[in-house]
A protein has these predicted regions:
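Crotonase-fold acyl-CoA enzyme core
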Residues: 84-196
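Short, active-site-adjacent cap segments at secondary-structure transitions
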Residues: 52-56, 101-102, 207-210
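Catalytic-core regions built around general acid/base machinery
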Residues: 33-36, 77-89
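Conserved CoA-thioester-binding segment of acyl-CoA-metabolizing enzymes
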Residues: 1-49
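Amphipathic alpha-helical segments at domain termini/boundaries
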Residues: 1-18, 154-194, 202-214, 219-227
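Terminal peptide-recognition signature
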Residues: 13, 29-30, 48, 60, ...
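Glycine- (often His-adjacent) and acidic-residue-rich active-site loop
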Residues: 3, 42, 49-81
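A general structural signal for well-ordered alpha-helical segments in protein cores
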Residues: 27, 61, 78, 139, ...
Length: 227
């Protein structure tokens, strides 16, 4: 299960070493840990990391197909987690050592900054290829966090971006060797840890006001699983 570690002023949220898919228990655990960091005394920053070949593969579609009655609450929780991170008064960095797909890629986009592995690992929004349209809130998140041409290409083609391509496309700020992903993300986060939480939160919540409103609109954020 996800857990917190600490490196000086930087909290490291470890997602796990599996596919890190979003079922209710997983999302609740991650949300609780993010809130724990938000409540911690300043200065502090957050890095979200994982181990293995996958950072996160997003929604747990198998779990959802077996718990149809729980899909709506799960989606509400996922959108709330995105909103929590997007408007957080804490600097956030995603340390992406492996694949970030679908909802996992969106989780990365909810962070302020992304550092990727250079030689392996894809950033991909494959919804167009698995016949699951983005929710209103997801669309708002993606288009508010990516350059317009990149958002259009990523959402409508399902392109897989490697680390260097992600940097060129404005998805990530750096692509480094595997063993440097987490240390580099921690260094980037540590340099920002002294930002005033109230000021940072006000800036982010005003900057992304329309996206946060879209993420909170449950009626517009349902999906239908492919049959």
């Amino acid at each position: 299960m996800p857990h917190l570690e600490r490196d000086g002023e930087v909290y490291v949220l470890q997602l796990g070493d599996g596919e890190n898919r979003f079922n209710q228990d997983f999302v609740d655990a991650v949300t609780s840990l993010v809130q724990e960091v938000a409540a911690a005394p300043a200065p502090r920053a957050l890095v979200t990391a994982a181990s293995g070949k996958i950072w996160s593969n997003g929604l747990d579609l198998e779990w959802m197909s077996e718990h149809v009655e729980a899909i709506e609450p799960l989606l509400d929780s996922v959108h709330a987690l995105y909103a929590e991170l997007l408007g957080l008064g804490v600097p956030t960095v995603a340390a992406i050592q492996g694949h970030a797909f679908a909802g996992g890629a969106m989780l990365a986009l909810a962070h302020d900054i992304r550092v990727m592995r250079a030689d392996r690992g894809w950033f991909c929004l494959p919804e167009v290829d698995i016949n699951i349209p983005f929710t209103h809130g997801m669309s708002a998140l993606i288009t508010s966090r990516l350059p317009v041409p990149t958002a259009h290409e990523a959402m409508t083609t399902g392109r897989r971006y490697g680390g260097a391509e992600a940097v060129q496309a404005g998805i990530a700020v750096e692509a480094v060797a595997e063993e440097q992903v987490l240390p580099r993300a921690v260094a980037v986060a540590a340099a920002l840890a002294g930002k005033d939480p109230q000021t940072l939160q006000a800036i982010k919540q005003r900057m992304y006001a329309s996206t946060l409103a879209a993420l909170a609109d449950s009626a517009a954020n349902s999906i239908s699983l492919p049959t």
